[in-house]
């Protein structure tokens, strides 16, 4: 009898989204294995050092995924404020005990692992905002403090991230919160005010940080200074150019031989394009599109069944993955400034992979509960 119940439960999970999730992660493991070889041998005397760690992160993410989808959404909601406070604490202590890499203080080292609290911030803040929109909807729309409270919390997170500095994740937090408020029916003038405030903040940050001005200028014309501010982008474009239509073949990248910095993290799409070509790159982007589409579909179905928390959270995850993909790929191909963001599911990074697996586990759990409710309603007819 228990086995039959398990089979019925498996039937109600979104198998397409799960298949896309696993497929993209396996592709990521393969590309990271190729892109990180020269870095592994130079830094750790092991060709597959980063590949093995990435595989470990995948199994850990997979384990957490299967733990989370077993927990009812209403139980997860109880812990959103505790999770918010813990994440806020980690974002503060990262400045005290964190490791600095390439001038950024984003990682807390615990044994063999490094935690990046800024990655966890996306999941935890969007969970909190989604819960707040549902439980405090009238206050949010009608009272000034009700509107300002989540804005202040979001701005605290954004400021702490900007201090690291982490402009990419700060933008994702800000823009996703803004779009969630718009989706919730918040007054258009309030949303416009938030947007203009964000633009003004970005403008001020660019003016007072010379390296950000150089990034903007190098994005506009990377070939003007190809060996300094434009180096990453020119090397990235060269990698994509070498790939042409069908690519040089898996493992045959030249740019990964330390010509392109961050080849296995932020710029992995360049190596993917070089080795798998235009066709391989498009296939990956199509798969990412369908992941986002399935998540938005779950969000829409949640609203139809009046499961508003699941709806807002699903949309927040879809917006987050959309923005992160656009910013990463846009930076790599030279149509947007480089933000230092990973490509979801593909880039090397334990915190990034674990966080995104956890977020999608909650989305799939939401969808599971919708399907169960629909099935039970059908049986009662």
Swiss-Prot record:
Superkingdom: Bacteria
Name under which the protein is recorded: Probable peptidoglycan glycosyltransferase FtsW
KW Cell membrane (keyword) present: yes
Compartments, record wording: Cell inner membrane
Secretion signal, residue range per the UniProt entry: none
Reaction(s) catalysed by this chain's protein: [GlcNAc-(1->4)-Mur2Ac(oyl-L-Ala-gamma-D-Glu-L-Lys-D-Ala-D-Ala)](n)-di-trans,octa-cis-undecaprenyl diphosphate + beta-D-GlcNAc-(1->4)-Mur2Ac(oyl-L-Ala-gamma-D-Glu-L-Lys-D-Ala-D-Ala)-di-trans,octa-cis-undecaprenyl diphosphate = [GlcNAc-(1->4)-Mur2Ac(oyl-L-Ala-gamma-D-Glu-L-Lys-D-Ala-D-Ala)](n+1)-di-trans,octa-cis-undecaprenyl diphosphate + di-trans,octa-cis-undecaprenyl diphosphate + H(+)
Topological region Cytoplasmic: 1-15, 75-81, 131-143, 300-317, 365-381
Periplasmic side: 37-53, 103-109, 165-166, 209-278, 339-343
GO molecular function: lipid-linked peptidoglycan transporter activity; peptidoglycan glycosyltransferase activity
E.C. no: 2.4.99.28
Family per record: Belongs to the SEDS family. FtsW subfamily.
Keywords carried by this UniProt record: Cell cycle, Cell division, Cell inner membrane, Cell membrane, Cell shape, Cell wall biogenesis/degradation, Glycosyltransferase, Membrane, Peptidoglycan synthesis, Transferase, Transmembrane, Transmembrane helix
Matches recorded under InterPro entries: Cell_cycle_FtsW-rel_CS, FtsW, FtsW/RodA
Alphabetical list of Pfam families matching this protein: FTSW_RODA_SPOVE
Species assigned in the record: Wigglesworthia glossinidia brevipalpis
Pathway of action: Cell wall biogenesis; peptidoglycan biosynthesis
GO cellular component terms given for this protein: cell division site; plasma membrane
Bilayer disposition of the protein: Multi-pass membrane protein
Known function: Peptidoglycan polymerase that is essential for cell division.
């Amino acid at each position: 009898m228990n086995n039959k119940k398990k089979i019925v439960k498996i039937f109600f999970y979104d198998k397409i989204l799960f298949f896309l999730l696993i497929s993209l992660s396996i592709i990521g493991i393969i590309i990271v294995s190729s892109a990180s070889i020269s870095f592994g041998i130079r830094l750790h005397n092991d060709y597959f050092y980063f590949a093995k760690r990435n595989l470990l992160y995948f199994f850990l993410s997979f384990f957490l995924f299967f733990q989370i989808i077993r927990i009812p959404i209403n139980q997860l909601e109880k812990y959103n404020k505790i999770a918010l406070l813990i994440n806020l604490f980690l974002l503060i202590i990262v400045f005290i005990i964190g490791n600095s890499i390439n001038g950024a203080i984003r990682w807390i080292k615990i044994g063999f692992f490094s935690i990046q609290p800024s990655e966890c911030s996306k999941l935890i803040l969007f969970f909190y905002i989604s819960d707040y929109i549902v439980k405090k909807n009238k206050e949010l729309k009608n009272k000034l403090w009700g509107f300002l409270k989540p804005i202040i919390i979001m701005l605290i997170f954004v400021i702490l991230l900007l201090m690291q500095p982490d402009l990419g994740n700060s933008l994702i937090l800000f823009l996703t919160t803004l779009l969630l408020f718009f989706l919730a029916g918040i007054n258009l003038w309030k949303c416009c005010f938030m947007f203009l405030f964000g633009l003004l903040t970005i403008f001020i940050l660019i003016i007072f940080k010379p390296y950000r001005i150089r990034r903007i200028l190098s994005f506009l014309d990377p070939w003007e200074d190809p060996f300094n501010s434009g180096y990453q982008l020119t090397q990235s474009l060269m990698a994509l150019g070498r790939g042409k239509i069908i690519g040089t073949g898996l493992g045959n990248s030249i740019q990964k031989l330390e010509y392109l910095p961050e080849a296995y993290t932020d710029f992995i799409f360049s190596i993917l394009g070089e080795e798998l070509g235009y066709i391989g790159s498009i296939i990956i982007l199509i798969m990412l599109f369908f992941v986002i589409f399935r998540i938005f579909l779950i969000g829409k179905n949640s609203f139809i069944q009046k499961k508003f928390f699941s709806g807002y959270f699903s949309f927040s995850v879809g917006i987050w993955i959309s923005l992160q993909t656009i910013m990463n790929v846009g930076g790599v191909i030279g149509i947007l400034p480089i933000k230092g963001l990973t490509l979801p599911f593909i880039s090397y990074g334990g915190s990034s992979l674990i966080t995104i697996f956890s977020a999608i586990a909650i989305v799939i759990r939401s969808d599971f509960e919708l399907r169960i409710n629909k099935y039970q309603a059908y049986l009662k007819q």
